[in-house]
């Protein structure tokens, strides 16, 4: 299985869009939405190659809290222990 490239010392970024779609920001996955299971499998492979890597969840300001918590739980199952959050502002519409 190929290791997914993550630049040295840079966190792995997981984006959660307003509709709950999950994107893993690596070269091979950044342009397609992933299921929770796909995300967990990709992240597990990344952690095999880079244990201890920081993960940052970039969530849309309007994404449901429950969705963020579900993604965090799956990341922990995949081996992530250092998980941070970045929120994107809620649109002014």
Regions of interest found by a model, annotated:
Residues 34-49:
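Periplasmic peptidoglycan-binding/anchoring modules of Gram-negative envelope and division proteins
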